[in-house]
Amino acid sequence: MQSQFDKICKFKKFYKNDENEKYNIFVIPIFYYDKYRRLGPKGVYKNKSEERQLAFIRNLKANIENLHNGNIPSNWKFRIYYDKSLTNFEYEGVKVWNKLFSVISKSNKIQLIRFKCSRYYSCKKHCKLFGTLIRFHPLYIKEKNVISVNCIDSDNYISTKRLNELIKFIDSKYDINVFCSKYEFPRYKDLSRKDNFECYFRAGLISSKISFGEKKWDEAFADIDNPKSNFTKSFNNIIKHLKVFFPDEIQNKDNLYFEFGFDEIFLNYFIKNIIYKEKYKVRYVHYQPSYT
């Protein structure tokens, strides 16, 4: 039976699987958001859309080079979820994503999937940073070829240290792996809710060897769309503490749904709930938080 989410979201795969192949996937979402504003020096906001796109391209190229010629084991692949907004980005007169995809699509280690979610789509692009949530989609679907799903940020380079920890996780008894710090402020977490975990989860630093199930994915988006859901109440609590601790971040924003940090709100609410209720075993890799 088709999930409710898949009725409003279309995924077009540009790769084929070997039926007997088993592999691990790094998952990244890539899209173009032309209003990616971040607070800079002296409290001045700057549009960093172009800067972010160039960082995505630079790190993706480095990761793919490492995948083919570096220390990433042969049973790993990159899965890239993207939407048509990338065609809106040009740099020095070149549609760089079209050029890059035409090259990497020939590799059997790259899985390109184009997505379009009609409910969250208008004017040739998805709502704000909605695309960041799509990286979690493989956590909820069962794929017989996939050993583990490893969510990363689009501008992250897979370091040797991180890769070694993921390899340890795959060979371990644990279901979930997270890189986190006990000392990091839970910026996008509801501080009024009890948390049974050692630390705040980051959206680009979680891995899983189990599938949460498509029903849970549907339920999450039903709650997101419901103004009276417990999630909405929790989200409003987060906005309240952002107004206290990070007022500059939310100024001049009338609707914070799918804004920066929404993927971590999703992770620390929905995915943590599943892990806790199902009693999945979590492996923690602690690191020193960055305050820059």
Predicted regions and their residues:
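Short, solvent-exposed loop/turn segments at secondary-structure junctions
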Residues: F31-K35, S85-T87, C117-Y120, N156-S159, ...
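Catalytic core and acceptor-binding pocket of nucleotide-sugar-dependent glycosyltransferases
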Residues: A203-T292
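Short, hydrophobic/amphipathic alpha-helical patches that form generic packing surfaces
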Residues: R58-N69, H137-I141, I265-N273
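GT-A fold catalytic core of metal-dependent nucleotide-sugar glycosyltransferases
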Residues: L112-R114, K128-E184
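A short, glycine-/small-residue-rich helix N-cap motif at loop->alpha-helix starts
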Residues: F56, C123-T132
